[in-house]
Amino acid sequence: MITVFTPSYADDRNTNAQNLTVKEVVARMDPSRFRVVMLGAGVSDPRIAGRSNTRVLPWRKHGNTARILLHLLTHVPDAYFFPREGPLDAAFLAARASLRLRSALVTYVVSGGLSEQSDRPILMRAIREGDVVAANSVHMSRTVESLGGRDVRTVYDGIDRRYYYPSGERKIQQMRLTVLFAGSFRHYKRADLVVREAAKHPEVDYRLAGAGEEESACRQLAESIGCNNVNFLGHLTALQLGEEMRRADILFFPSEIEGHPQVLGQAAACGLPCVARNSYQPDYVVDGMTGVLAGSDGQLGEALSRLIAEPDLRRQMSAAAAKHAAKFEWDRVTGQWQEIMECAIERRSQSRRK
């Protein structure tokens, strides 16, 4: 039996992208081969709560780093999966090195905007010291290799088919088109550009799903420029987001800094053509076939205007997007992770014998 610890949350209501990934993987891992220990601050995902050989360590208001580190030192896991960048990760990496713990380090890199100048010492250490390092797109894998990662693998995030799937019936042509944005309201997500594009197309409805510190500024912008075709939806559950995607006609995602955003895969699975930036080279979007990847604000706006004006192009891209999204399956992804865990443990064992 292999014991895997991950500093990820089992909570059912936690929709952080990294935690969503781990929950999907853990829920599918073979319980006869893998015992999993993870964190919990609320009610667990029922699939994880019902999984045998699974333990959820409670995350409390105080003292978590010391308490959980003590657990890891007295119950040393075979693998430490998906380190983050908090004090627990820093403490464990230090203990692993100084005590030469048997725990294999399986590093998964998913965040964009990385460079040699990035002030992220915990992540950089996890990349350098990982027994196996993986990233969530081809572009991210190349980036991580440039930062010192060795033999970096590409492991995509899958798509949760419980929530993200095409409409079962042919979409009825609506009187007004709908453009959807989904993401946190942070400066780099560029929700402000969604509002500005909405002002150019008053005949189209724009729906923005998400919450964050920039939401108030975006609401004020919409009011100041007289934009009455914008609807702010707030934070949505996965079920609600899937429903919004099936009602929409286009996903407009102008975010500037990304790793490989799951929302693009989710939208594709719902048959939505996507307009996004080409800077992070998302594999969920095939440029010119399932959507459009653009390099500037102006090019994003041009691509969006073209999709709004050309219904035949939207239909072609919609069908191609749903077909392309079928490649991203969680069962296959979980199989990759199980093989990676075993490989990392063997590598760690060999390195400790030297």
Short names for language-model regions:
Residues 127, 235-236, 243-248:
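Short alpha-helical donor nucleotide-sugar binding micro-motif in glycosyltransferases
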Residues 287-298, 306-311:
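Conserved acidic donor-binding segment of nucleotide-sugar-dependent glycosyltransferases
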Residues 3-5, 172-189, 195-201, 207:
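Conserved donor-binding/catalytic core segment of Leloir-type glycosyltransferases
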